[in-house]
Every structure is written in C-alpha cells, then in structure tokens.
Amino acid sequence: MSFKKVFPAVLVVTLALSGCSAVKNLLPSKESTNFLNGTNAKNGPVLVVKIDDTTQAHPQIGLEDADVVYIEQVEGGLTRLAAVFSSVIPQRIGPVRSARISDIDIVSQYGRVAFAYSGAQRKFLPVIEAANLEDLGAQHEGSSIYTTDPNRTPPYAMVLRADLLMKKISDRNLVIDTAKDIGFVFSDKNDGGVPTDKAVMHWPAATYSANWSESEKRWLLSHNNQPDIAESGVHLGPTTLVIQMVSITPSEYKDKLGGVTPLSHTIGSGKAYVLRNGELFAGSWNRTSAESGTTFAMPNGDPINFAAGQVWIALTDREPDFTSRPSNNSK
C-alpha cells in the first residue's frame, strides 16, 4: 500500500482530533507542479533516506519513486545514496545505511526534512541532532519501521517501512516541510546542448554509467558495469542527470574500521554537466548558503532547464567521460 493512498486519510483523522498546526505542515501543498521533479504532482512532506550503494546492496528498493537521488562518496572511495521523496512515498525503501557528514549540507536546502538512516558514528550524532531536520534514525524507532528483509544478508537487509514512518510522524505531530523551490528550473527544452549517448561517472572505487534511451526518454543507469535494476524490476534512470563537480576533502570523522569519511562540499560554486533529452549541457552550479538552493547555469548565465521527471545528482571530483553522436541523430 502506498503512502499516496493512505496518508491523506490519516491526516484527516489526525487534524480532526488535534487541530494541531504542526500536522498541517504534513499536508501536500496545492501546487500543481512538484518543485523537485517538475511533473504534475503535489508537493508533499520531504523524506530523505540514506541507501546503501555497494554491489551487495543491489537491487535497491523504492528508488524508482524518488524525486531526487544524490550519489555521494563515502569511505574507501565507495558511493552511497541520499534519496529524496515528496511526490510519492513508497511503502518500502532500502537497504538503509548510516548517515555521513556530507548529508547535512545536502538536505539543509530542502528545509526541515524527515531524515531516515540506520545509524551514525557516535561523534557525528550530535551534529545530526543539532541540524534543522527531524532525526528519525533507526536508533529512535522500532523494528516494525526499520525492518529486516529475510531474503537479504545484514548489513544489507535493513528496509524502511516508509508508510509506517510517515504515519508515526503524523501521530506525533512532528513538523516536516513540504517540497519547495530549491533552485531547479524545468522546461520542455533547453537550447545549446551537445547530442550525447553516454556518460560515465567515476569515484575511487565505484563507477556509474548512463545511456540515453530514446524510447524511454531517460538515462538508463549501470552501477559498476551492471544494469541498475530495482527490486521491482524497473531499470533505474532519471530524465535529468546532473554531474556536479565538487571538492571532496577528508573530514574529522571515521567509520568503525578507521576509514576517514570524505566531505563533499556542496555550498559554493563549481563546474556542472546536465544531461537531458539525449543532450549534454556544460555549465556551472552555485549555492550561496546551507539554506539556499542550488542553481545550474549555462556559461552565458541562462539557467540550465531540467526535463520534468526524476533527477539524479552525482557529486564527484573526477571528470566524467562522454560519448557524443552526430547532431542529426539526436533526440
């Protein structure tokens, strides 16, 4: 059963009983266009879930319903995902893994979000508690919400019952912001692109590739040279793929094996590549503060328009590779 079907009824009952203004923040706004994906969908409360991205964690659960997915570097040069849900919140999401320091700045531009994760380094927990988010980590919730999938092997078996978590948020009258403008501009087209078939993104111990599908009008992903297929059987792939070039530096935190946690710097400015509709747009990104959104612009200052639909943002400090094609075969 999906959140989209259950949640409004829960809200009606809760509001009738409590009349609490905090709960009203969980009501999807009346906007006809979702700020995060540009489609004709409501702007619901924002849930961010940390998801394991190792080979053992695949196939992942629920990512096909995310509005935005961030790929971030973690210890050992591996990647981990931060999935942002608003328009639709699926029943199950996972496998859930622990939070990292890069998450704080990534999620702050969304306002006060519901933040779901498996745990964190003890030294880092006070930072999460002090951040402008609702800390809903597994250490605070029961096993009925952070479940164990019997068909998976720990630590790749924790699966979030997102529907139950959102009901608990309503029952507790917690304040969660609905989706808002975070800098994305959506349009049917964007001029000045280079026809492109494929992009390859690099991290020290992981790779992603994206191949343009003319029939599906999206970039079909592969993870470590294997098709990125969700548990549902859906081939994961966004309509807009952003490669955001960032500085990645060692942080003061370490994992339980002593590996230094990298910090991806997402406040500031830098180079960006945006892929949509089978074309590549080279430009820049800019973000002035933790609370402000991230904008993407062409060299002349015009915004780079995203295509309506799911957005993936790869945070990396390594230049990607692109395979272009003759312009008369584009789109």
What are these regions, as identified by a protein language model?
Residues M1-F7:
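Bacterial N-terminal signal peptides that target proteins for export
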Residues L17-G19:
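C-terminal motif of bacterial Sec signal peptides marking the signal peptidase cleavage site
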Residues S21-K24:
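Bacterial signal peptide processing site
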Residues L26-G44, V48-V68, E75-K331:
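A surface/extracellular/periplasmic glyco- and lipid-processing/surface-interacting theme
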